[in-house]
């Protein structure tokens, strides 16, 4: 019969604050799994280390350049037609601003992965908060686009233009305010955790060194899952199901169908990029709540999955301009005119570079009587 194992607890002393800090430095992600009762190794495998130190800097640099140029072009094109912008285009303008905010934090992510966080607490709080603000504003703006299309197509709501634009601007301002308020936990509790050995790097994380901070972390996670993802996704699904059903009933107005198609594509790309991250984060939350059996193996898998899925989500910031370019007829026309004015390219060269860009589509959009990004 196996004899029980006894430990001389007097010979082992722990500083609990140091223990919390050691356990908090789990991965390079801002979402850090913390185990209360399972002591797992924090050493990363060679593949994940190579991914963070070699692939991520190159990929994030490319995303930074594409996202910066693409979203600035979107803002310039939409700003040129500020007085004739539709409600959907106003939402897309703010969506491009949110994506630019996400683009700005990519260099910080690259630097942290290479040398750790060396930029102090203020920038640590700012960068983590901007990450959350971007996601909240993006999801809420896409939900507003879905509601706007639903009201315009299913219920044929066409309000007086000035009153409608005023309500759109108020809605966008409210979304930005909500995004800031939802990111307050990050502004209050994010901090730089210094390493306790030469193998670790300083990390910018959501501090969980006491019970109050841990509760704030759980509240932030709950808000992230529900207000930032689940509820907006349900709103989008409900609205677009109604829109598609109405368009299938009335086989008319192909221009309106194209507008809805691009809106659905933008929403779909957002969900494809961010859904894996939210699924993994939700599993991590369940593990933290001990709703699932915790193990070092599961924690290791979650650490790798969080890093990979967060990369996919961050890549989203450069995809919307590409989508507008290849799926939006009027946007292509505006982009072509802008590039021609800048001396970069004209419709003919763009059609040669992209065979799918038919000159007919460019001329068709130029003859349109109303501006539409789609």
From Swiss-Prot:
The record's account of tissue expression is:
Expressed in neuronal and lymphatic tissue.
Q: Which residues are glycosylated?
A: 28, 198
- Which regions face the Cytoplasmic side of the membrane? 79-90, 148-169, 243-261, 328-374
Annotated S-S bridges:
124-204
Cellular localization per UniProt: Cell membrane
Q: How does it sit in the membrane?
A: Multi-pass membrane protein
Question: For side Extracellular, which residue ranges?
Answer: 1-57, 112-126, 191-221, 283-306
**Entry's Gene Ontology BP terms:** B cell activation; calcium-mediated signaling; cell chemotaxis; immune response; leukocyte chemotaxis; lymph node development; positive regulation of cytokinesis; positive regulation of cytosolic calcium ion concentration
What's the chief localization of this chain?
Answer: membrane
Annotated GO molecular function terms are: C-C chemokine binding; C-C chemokine receptor activity; C-X-C chemokine receptor activity
Q: Which GO terms describe its cellular component?
A: external side of plasma membrane
| Keyword field | B-cell activation, Cell membrane, Disulfide bond, G-protein coupled receptor, Glycoprotein, Membrane, Receptor, Transducer, Transmembrane, Transmembrane helix
The regions listed as transmembrane in this protein's record are 58-78, 91-111, 127-147, 170-190, 222-242, 262-282, 307-327
Q: What does this protein do?
A: Cytokine receptor that binds to B-lymphocyte chemoattractant (BLC). Involved in B-cell migration into B-cell follicles of spleen and Peyer patches but not into those of mesenteric or peripheral lymph nodes.
Q: What is the similarity comment for this entry?
A: Belongs to the G-protein coupled receptor 1 family.
This chain's protein is named C-X-C chemokine receptor type 5
**Organism this protein belongs to:** Rattus norvegicus
Q: What is the lineage of its organism?
A: Eukaryota, Metazoa, Chordata, Craniata, Vertebrata
């Amino acid at each position: 019969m196996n004899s029980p194992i006894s430990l001389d607890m007097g010979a082992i002393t722990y500083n609990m604050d140091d223990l919390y800090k050691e356990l908090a430095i789990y991965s390079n992600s801002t979402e850090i799994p913390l185990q209360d009762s399972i002591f797992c190794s924090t050493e990363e495998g060679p593949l994940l280390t190579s991914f963070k130190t070699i692939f991520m800097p190159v990929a994030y640099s490319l995303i930074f350049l594409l996202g910066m140029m693409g979203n600035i072009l979107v803002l310039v094109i939409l700003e040129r037609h500020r007085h004739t912008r539709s409600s959907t285009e106003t939402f897309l303008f703010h969506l491009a601003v949110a994506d630019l905010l996400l683009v700005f934090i990519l260099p910080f992510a690259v630097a942290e992965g290479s040398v750790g966080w060396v930029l102090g607490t203020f920038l640590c709080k700012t960068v983590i908060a901007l990450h959350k603000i971007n996601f909240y504003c993006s999801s809420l703006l896409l939900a507003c686009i879905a509601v706007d299309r639903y009201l315009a197509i299913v219920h044929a709501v066409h309000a007086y233009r000035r009153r409608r634009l005023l309500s759109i601007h108020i809605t966008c301002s409210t979304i930005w305010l909500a995004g800031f308020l939802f990111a307050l936990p990050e502004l209050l509790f994010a901090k730089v955790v210094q390493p306790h050995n030469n193998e670790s790097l300083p990390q910018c994380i959501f501090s969980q060194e006491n019970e109050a901070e841990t509760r704030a972390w759980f509240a932030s996670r709950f808000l992230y899952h529900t207000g930032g993802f689940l509820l907006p996704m349900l709103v989008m699904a409900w609205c677009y199901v109604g829109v598609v059903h109405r368009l299938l009933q009335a086989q008319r107005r192909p221009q309106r169908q194209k507008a809805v198609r691009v809106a659905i594509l933008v929403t779909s790309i957002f969900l494809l990029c961010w859904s894996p991250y939210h699924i993994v984060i939700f599993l991590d939350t369940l593990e933290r709540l001990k709703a699932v059996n915790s193990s070092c193996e599961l924690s290791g898998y979650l650490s790798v999955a969080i890093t990979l899925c967060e990369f996919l989500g961050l890549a989203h910031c450069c995809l919307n301009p590409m989508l507008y370019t290849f799926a939006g007829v009027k946007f292509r026309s505006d982009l072509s005119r802008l590039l021609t004015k800048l001396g970069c390219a004209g419709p003919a060269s763009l059609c040669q570079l992209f065979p799918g860009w038919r000159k007919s589509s460019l001329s068709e959009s130029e003859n349109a009587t109303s501006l539409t990004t789609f």
